[in-house]
């Protein structure tokens, strides 16, 4: 069976090819219908309004080549940035995250804790509530993001 990339996958790949060096596409998603939202990060500088406007002008032609002519929104991933790739989990070892998995692990789907270790197939999370460790495979993660304690 031949698996074809989804429209969002194709658009994401076009964006990644067009982005300047040192800029990362953290997440792409359709928001509010035809609005394509791109969360981007970059090395050595802020993701401010000027940078986002520049990214739109860079990626718009690449998206048009893929047949997308809708609206584009570019923004920073924020302080509770999504973790969408294994490399993100590696980068944030030692940081607190919130993770949702598709199939229950140890009878639950939602976890909050600190990333302890990362392997090729998954990662180990030290749970906030009891300090226990749970191993979660990357393939089971449906949503994950940094969890900042804003009360400190």
From Swiss-Prot:
One family from Pfam that matches here is RimP_N
Please tell me whether the keyword Cytoplasm is annotated for this protein.
yes
Subcellular localization(s) per the UniProt record:
Cytoplasm
User: Which BP terms from GO are recorded?
Assistant: ribosomal small subunit assembly; translation
- InterPro entries in UniProt: Ribosome_maturation_RimP, RimP_C, RimP_C_sf, RimP_N, RimP_N_sf
Q: Which family, according to the similarity comment?
A: Belongs to the RimP family.
The UniProt function text for this chain reads: Required for maturation of 30S ribosomal subunits.
* Protein name listed in UniProt: Ribosome maturation factor RimP
């Amino acid at each position: 069976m031949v698996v074809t990339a989804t429209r969002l996958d194709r658009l994401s790949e076009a964006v990644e090819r067009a982005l300047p060096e040192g800029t990362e596409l953290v997440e792409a998603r359709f928001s509010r219908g035809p609005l394509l939202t791109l969360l981007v990060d970059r090395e050595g500088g802020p993701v401010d309004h000027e940078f986002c406007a520049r990214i739109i002008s860079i990626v718009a032609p690449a998206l048009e080549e893929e047949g997308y002519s809708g609206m584009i929104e570019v923004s920073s991933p924020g302080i509770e940035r999504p973790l969408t790739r294994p490399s993100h989990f590696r980068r944030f070892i030692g940081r607190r995250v919130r993770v949702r998995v598709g199939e229950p692990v140890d009878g639950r789907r939602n976890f909050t804790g600190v990333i302890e270790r990362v392997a090729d197939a998954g990662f180990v999370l030290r749970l906030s509530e009891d300090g226990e460790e749970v191993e979660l495979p990357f393939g089971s993660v449906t949503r994950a993001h940094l969890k900042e304690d804003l009360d400190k």
